[in-house]
């Protein structure tokens, strides 16, 4: 397989919709364009997982991605885990499609011999390490997220460090919603790393339309 570019949207929210378009419908359109949409819902202490679970799961399902509900102290490791799991899921999907083309539509990774399956998984792991990755981070900056944004910023730095340990190239971009003048506003344009994230921290504040 040729090394390609995986495109992801990472939505970080409190799981309660604001103004604007239906997020599930937008996720569906993105997925149809080949972009995986992952969603992380951040809970307030004392709030049950079930209260924000439905919307978060629905958006991720429509976007063909992964979803997790966490408290803010677990956000950093969850951001990294979800991003990497989504990469693995997408790559396995590509590999399974290639196998179907070669071996027939009924064939899948589980249908081949253990030895061949091990070889296939080696290919998946290699592609995870070498493929190019573009992640557009979409951060909910509604008033309810005010006490979580500092943790979000730290998590994005950790994500950049983690992904840049791979040999494949990475590009990141950060948008916020709701914006002050529009539903969605760009905070940080495409860059290979987020180590200079502090430069746009002042823009990533709660509040908006």
Label the predicted regions.
Residues 1-3, 127-128, 163-166:
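Surface-exposed acidic, glycine-flexible loop patches that form ligand/cofactor-binding
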Residues 2-6, 13-62, 70:
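VWA/integrin I-like adhesion module and closely mimicked acidic/polar interface patches used
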Residues 8-12, 131-188:
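Von Willebrand factor
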Residues 16, 142, 146-148, 202-207:
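Second-shell loop/turn segments in exported
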Residues 47-57, 171-203:
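Short beta-strand-loop
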Residues 50-53, 79-84:
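Short secondary-structure transition/capping segments
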Residues 66-75:
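Short acidic-hydrophobic, aromatic-tinged amphipathic segments that line or gate anion-handling sites
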Residues 82-136, 143-148:
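Acidic, polar low-complexity linker/tail segments
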């Amino acid at each position: 397989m040729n090394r390609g570019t995986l495109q992801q949207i990472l939505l970080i929210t409190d799981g309660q919709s604001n103004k604007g378009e239906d997020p599930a419908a937008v996720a569906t359109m993105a997925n149809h364009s080949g972009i995986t949409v992952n969603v992380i819902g951040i809970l307030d202490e004392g709030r049950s997982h079930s209260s924000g679970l439905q919307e978060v799961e629905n958006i991720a399902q429509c976007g063909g991605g992964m979803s997790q509900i966490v408290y803010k102290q677990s956000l950093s490791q969850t951001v990294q885990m979800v991003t990497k799991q989504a990469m693995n899921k997408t790559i396995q999907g590509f590999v399974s499609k290639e196998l179907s083309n070669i071996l027939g539509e009924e064939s899948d990774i589980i249908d081949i011999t253990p030895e061949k399956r091990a070889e296939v998984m080696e290919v998946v792991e290699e592609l995870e390490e070498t493929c190019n990755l573009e992640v557009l981070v979409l951060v909910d900056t509604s008033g309810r997220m005010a006490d979580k944004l500092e943790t979000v910023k730290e998590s994005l730095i950790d994500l950049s460090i983690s992904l840049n340990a791979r040999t494949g190239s990475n590009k990141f971009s950060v948008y916020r919603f709701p914006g002050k003048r529009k539903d969605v506003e760009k905070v940080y344009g495409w860059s290979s790393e987020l180590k200079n994230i502090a430069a746009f921290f002042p823009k990533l504040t709660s509040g908006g339309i």
